[in-house]
């Protein structure tokens, strides 16, 4: 993927106030960040979609370590641009039991500054591999994805205390790195 300097998102930085959001998870339950933060810290994951083997590997490892994350006083929430029918495929592949949220219109992703436009050449390459990003994400003219990112948001204060943000989608924060950052 080719990104110009102007198009490159930077993500939010440590000590930034985490933008509140309200969305529906795969179980039809409303998740509101500020309500979750009353009782626990939040590990917020942005992932590209069920078609991405790197995302699936990360989400599966997080599911396998979910109890350890909970023991550290945190809840895990994952955000994707993919529509609910594709989220069900993510669940099949990863066994994820934590909230997976379809970010309709990418409002959450934009608030966290992780969104970028996918160039036409890349969209075409994915389409040739039977991955229709526009259809999966409910997008019409342009296709957008998130930079895979992890934010740890502090309980009560709601500030970002850890971030992992890397344009190289093959590189992800390890579960151990996330656990080490949870107090």
Question: Model features per residue range: what roles?
Answer:
Residues 37, 70, 143-145:
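Extracellular/periplasmic catalytic domains that process cell-envelope and extracellular macromolecules
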Residues 18-19, 41, 147-149:
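Short loop/turn microsegments at loop-to-beta-strand junctions
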Residues 169-183:
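A short, polar/charged loop-to-alpha-helix boundary motif
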Residues 57-113, 117:
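Structural microenvironment flanking redox-active thiols in thiol-disulfide oxidoreductases
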Residues 5-34:
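N-terminal "domain-start" segment that seeds a small globular fold
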Residues 106-168:
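Thiol/selenol-based redox catalytic cores and closely related redox-interacting motifs
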Residues 34-62:
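Short active-site neighborhood of thiol/selenol oxidoreductases, capturing the structured segment around
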């Amino acid at each position: 993927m080719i990104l110009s300097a102007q198009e490159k998102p930077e993500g939010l930085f440590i000590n930034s106030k985490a933008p509140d959001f309200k969305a529906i998870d795969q179980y039809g339950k409303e998740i509101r960040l500020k309500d979750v933060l009353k009782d626990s810290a939040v590990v917020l994951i942005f992932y590209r979609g069920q078609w991405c083997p790197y995302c699936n590997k990360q989400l599966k490892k997080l599911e396998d370590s979910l109890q350890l994350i909970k023991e550290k006083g945190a809840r895990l929430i994952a955000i994707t641009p993919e529509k609910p029918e594709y989220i069900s495929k993510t669940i099949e592949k990863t066994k994820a039991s934590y909230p997976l949220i379809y970010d309709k219109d990418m409002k959450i992703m934009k608030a966290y500054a992780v969104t970028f436009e996918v160039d036409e050449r890349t969209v075409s390459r994915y389409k040739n591999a039977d991955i229709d990003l526009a259809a999966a994400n409910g997008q019409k003219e342009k296709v957008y994805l998130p930079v895979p990112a992890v934010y740890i948001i502090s309980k009560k204060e709601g500030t970002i205390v850890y971030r992992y943000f890397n344009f190289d989608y093959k590189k992800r924060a390890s579960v151990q790195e996330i656990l080490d950052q949870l107090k």
